[in-house]
């Protein structure tokens, strides 16, 4: 996070390039994880470390209808 508590460009870019490293959706880009999966983590607790921070960020974007903001960051356009 940046000083203002907003995600930096690097974190947003990671959402469209980093794959889920474990679980039911292993190998799926974090930006492509289904909302119900992200919401489950929000209820049960995000894992520690960077993956947890990225999942929490993606859950916030998805929950607030802002996931389309990631489209320009995707490699495929």
Residue ranges and their predicted role:
Residues 1-77:
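DEDD superfamily 3′-5′ metal-dependent exonuclease/proofreading module
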